[in-house]
Amino acid sequence: MAHGLKVRFWGVRGSISCSGAEYARYGGHTSCLEVTAGGRRLIFDAGTGIRPLGLELARHPEVDIDIFFTHTHLDHITGLTFFQPLFNKRNSVRLWAGHLQGPDTLKQVVSNLMQAPLYPVSLEVFQASVDFSEFICG
């Protein structure tokens, strides 16, 4: 991969994904932005747009990724559970959040999303090396 700057929008919708011909121009996925620079891949938000990004990344034998959450509303995290690189033990995925709302850590937020009755499996199904980190914005 060249070490230039590349930005790709995988999802730009707010609140809820949508489908249909009328959404073809901008797409129907919720928030997900990929930035590659200096040989690194940074992903901002994990809305439904992260699923097709994950399918593309799954073609690589090993990936090293940082995902930053602008905030943890459902439309910014819901695609994380379908992100294929999380299910490959050769991958490293670091999750970062600076705008948590409430007392939960980022790991607790994702764990809460991935539990009954909302989801059939827990975050322990992730096979990649996954790190959860919070930081103070400003």
Task: Walk through the language-model features, giving the residues of each.
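Binuclear metal-dependent hydrolase catalytic cores
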Residues: 1-138
